[in-house]
Amino acid sequence: MVKFRFAPSPTGHLHAGNARLAVVNALAARAMGGTLLLRIDDTDRERSKPEYEAGIEQDLRWLGIGWDEMARQSDRMDRYAAAAERLKAAGLLYPCFESEEELAAKRALRAKRHLPPVYDRAMLSLTAEQRAAAEAGGKRPYFRFKLSDGAVAWNDLVLGRREVALGTVSDPVLIRADGTPLYTFTSVVDDLELGVTHVVRGEDHVTNTAVQIDLMRALEPRRAVPAFGHLPLISDVTGEKLSKRAGSVSVRQFRRDGIEAMALVSYLARLGSRRDPEPLTLEELAGTFDLGDFSRGAPRFDPKQLLALNRRVLHGLPFEAVAERLPEGCGAEFWMAVRGNLDLLSEARLWWEVVSGEIETPSLPEAASLLRAALEALPPEPWDETTWKGWTGAVAAASGARGKALYLPLRLALTGESHGPELAALLPLIGRARAAARLERAAG
């Protein structure tokens, strides 16, 4: 069974970079007929918060992303402890006693000698007596995994063949001095025990993947490791790293700003791929989804492109899809009249005020004669979408005005705006009494 996973840490709000990974993993799982595991990586006791976890789940549901299985790392501490004991028994997890200052001094010395900052494995040579003496002196050990010799290679689902020489990498710390397991370790144990077959994450994990593959082989030598894929990290429009601490790129903020879930999902699903973004459902996106479509260059997250896609989404939404989010009293006729002019759904409220409330009618003394002619030619109700053409034809005949000289003063008087939805559709919604009052006020 194919199983992908999305593994956020509940240390903040879900941001665009992580949301993209959620979308990509969900789509890949659907495309391959597999399942999606939501794993909450909450071993950082100080920074992990229940409210962030709840917020992540809420954001995923808003995006339309469901999961088939859920796991929480804080519930699996016994599994990490058991795996650590197996590694210790095999001589692959060894205690270390250096302080941060001592490690920094070692790195500085290696840099001075023009050597890579790789851990020197000094603690491997400690005798049992030396270790006991260190602990008796109040030092608490942290534990490193002894990497294999040679290199680790894999066929990356996005980047192609990748190879990392393990001699260029420090033996990773798996267990802190306080006994807390670190991500490199917990992630491997979870992927093995929970049956994850595909891991798709950011390109910043490439070296970490080599380490984790080596660790997987140490824990389960007879088991196939998952397939790995690494997406290039998102940058902003200037090419700089997209900061996940910038509130403006959190899913929560996009939602508050009025971005539609379909627009955000469609944008993130195609960001960095050879396919142009278009407004599609998750099912439609999954139908053509292929990890091989993603390029190896860093994609740029452009809010203007997202807004343009949001506009396209709104223009195609039926009334039933938005009815509950529109101002009270709005009907299908209103929605069909204004949807083609919206960037954000919240803008519908402004046009509802235009057709049903009071507006600040501009004074247009230079167009007074035209507006009085329009008032006199205003036909009796009932009105429909043909009323506008007949009425403006009569006004043109009476005033001699044509084109912009005819239509702009009427639009300003009736809506208070110089641009907007087609007046043929708005006029029946405004109604005769309101239209007459506005024309009279504008004429002065």
From Swiss-Prot:
Main subcellular localisation: cytoplasm
What's its catalytic activity?
Answer: tRNA(Glu) + L-glutamate + ATP = L-glutamyl-tRNA(Glu) + AMP + diphosphate
Q: Which GO terms describe its molecular function?
A: ATP binding; glutamate-tRNA ligase activity; tRNA binding
Q: Which InterPro entries match?
A: aa-tRNA-synth_I_cd-bd, aa-tRNA-synth_I_codon-bd_sub2, aa-tRNA-synth_I_CS, aa_tRNA-synth_I_cd-bd_sf, Glu-tRNA-ligase_bac/mito, Glu/Gln-tRNA-synth, Glu/Gln-tRNA-synth_Ib_cat-dom, GluQ/Sye
Q: What GO cellular component entries does it have?
A: cytosol
Q: Where in the cell is it found?
A: Cytoplasm
> In its UniProt record, which GO terms are filed under biological process?
glutamyl-tRNA aminoacylation
Q: Which PROSITE patterns match?
A: AA_TRNA_LIGASE_I (PS00178)
| SUPFAM superfamilies per UniProt | An anticodon-binding domain of class I aminoacyl-tRNA synthetases, Nucleotidylyl transferase
Family designation? Belongs to the class-I aminoacyl-tRNA synthetase family. Glutamate--tRNA ligase type 1 subfamily.
**PANTHER family according to UniProt:** GLUTAMATE--TRNA LIGASE, GLUTAMATE--TRNA LIGASE, MITOCHONDRIAL-RELATED
Q: What is this protein called?
A: Glutamate--tRNA ligase 2
Q: Which gene encodes it?
A: gltX2
